[in-house]
Amino acid sequence: MKHVAPPPTTEAVFGDRLPLAQRYAEFLATAGVERGLIGPRETDRIWDRHILNSAALGELVESGDRIADIGSGAGLPGIPLALARPDVHVTLIEPMQRRCEFLTEVVDALGVAVIVVRGRAEDPAVRREVGEMDVVTSRAVGSLDKLATWSMGILRESGRMLALKGARAEAEIEENRRVLARAGAVDVRVLRCGADYLNPPATVVEARRATPSNGRGRPGRSSRR
């Protein structure tokens, strides 16, 4: 496999799982490129732009959280998050068979307890299979209005959507406030994370699924906590 050297700050993020993160980087730089999951020009910035950017979400989750990564693609942000935070439970949701095969190969090779589910987050069958989640993550999957609709559908009451976004995050929130509200998303805000090892830090849109007391919620569905 191609060796992709991590930056010096990476050990603080992954700890004793750094060798697994390095192996994942090699997967991305080889099979990921060959299968069209990562662009060939991305190999020189796999760590900063992809792996560390994804792992930064580890600052925003809690121990024991059940996390669904929707439209996982090459495993971003789900796999780096699982490596940085072995105390959470990650499920990768991806509709394309060839991508699911790649994800399964990576998960098996790394020996991590990550579940791969083929399907779309909005599919009732997927929702039944994965149940209600504490957190839903996403990266480069779709517009904020679509992400909110997909995410709220598999979140428990008060569960959180964490969507990695770019410089237009604030503007995207303003443009979609009505749709976000209809989807049951409340407390929508922009967070920055990974400032100790990313320049600029990762930009994340956080939203909570409404409960009957603060918004729409879903009548008849109970929260986990």
Swiss-Prot record:
Give UniProt keywords alphabetically: Cytoplasm, Methyltransferase, rRNA processing, S-adenosyl-L-methionine, Transferase
Tell whether Transmembrane helix is among the UniProt keywords: no
Q: What class of enzyme is it?
A: transferase
- Please state the Enzyme Commission number of this protein: 2.1.1.-
What CDD domains does the entry give?
A: AdoMet_MTases (cd02440)
By sequence similarity, the record places it as follows:
Belongs to the methyltransferase superfamily. RNA methyltransferase RsmG family.
Q: Know the name of this protein?
A: Ribosomal RNA small subunit methyltransferase G
Q: Which gene encodes it?
A: rsmG
